[in-house]
A protein has these predicted regions:
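Alpha-helical transmembrane segments of integral membrane proteins
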Residues: 9-42, 58, 85-217
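Short membrane-interfacial helix/loop motifs at transmembrane-helix boundaries
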Residues: 1-3
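Membrane-water interface segments at the C-terminal ends of transmembrane alpha-helices
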Residues: 48-80, 101, 108
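Conserved active-site segment immediately N-terminal to the catalytic lysine
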Residues: 45
Length: 217
């Protein structure tokens, strides 16, 4: 069970890490823009996009992306981690082939990511106040979202990995459940439970770091 887990966890962590970084790069600047342009057209557009992103399920976006970029435009393969000629490619070619197959799954994770919710941050209109004071006050909900998403970062995206046949921990766990592999299923669920407890602990610690008012004296 442990060996099987070690073989697939790395890919899920890479996908989750990339989607985390991309989501933060997108969400935080958009949140600041919405705060500095409160009730403007930009604010309403950002709010609408954020609401759509968190309201529609991941399989809906995954299906749309596959239909557009795989079926219509033929830019990416429909599923899998490598192409048919993977073995004949150079080391750099194999890297690019894997990266190409991870584009759509990662885009799906970014679109439905909880971090996009931070784009709805509100604040005062003055830029200096926003960047130096108000932004610090938005760190509490930001820490909550990041901490709550830690299990998903390391446990894989079961639906996304299954739809794109990416052999990460989520996909392998789903296959194990379908096949009745009880030992691996129990290991995966226990792993998720431990991650949830650790994420809650880290979230509480970070609360005290970003906001001294919640510290226990």
């Amino acid at each position: 069970v442990v060996q099987k887990f070690q073989e697939v966890i790395g890919l899920s962590v890479v996908m989750g890490g990339i989607s985390f970084v991309v989501s933060m790069i997108i969400a935080v600047p958009l949140g600041i823009l919405a705060a500095t342009k409160q009730y403007s057209r930009a604010d309403y557009v950002i709010t609408a996009v954020a609401l759509v992103g968190i309201s529609l399920p991941s399989f809906f976006f995954a299906t749309l992306l596959k239909l557009l970029f795989s079926v219509k435009l033929a830019w990416f393969d429909l599923y899998g981690l490598v192409g048919r000629d993977y073995a004949q490619l150079s080391s750099w070619g194999q890297f690019c082939d894997r990266a190409n197959h991870l584009v759509l799954p990662i885009v799906t994770l970014v679109i439905v990511s909880d971090y996009i919710r931070t784009a709805r941050a509100k604040g005062l209109s003055e830029h200096v106040v926003i960047y130096k004071h108000a932004f610090r006050n938005t760190l509490i909900p930001l820490v909550t979202i990041i901490g709550g998403s830690l299990p998903g970062l390391f446990s894989g995206a079961l639906i996304t990995e299954t739809l794109f046949s990416i052999p990460g921990i989520g996909y392998i766990s789903y296959q194990s459940m379908v096949a009745g592999d009880i030992p691996f299923t129990m290991f995966y669920l226990s792993f998720m439970a431990v991650l949830t407890l650790v994420s809650n602990l880290l979230t509480d610690i970070m609360y005290a770091v970003v906001d001294p008012r919640v510290r226990i004296s």
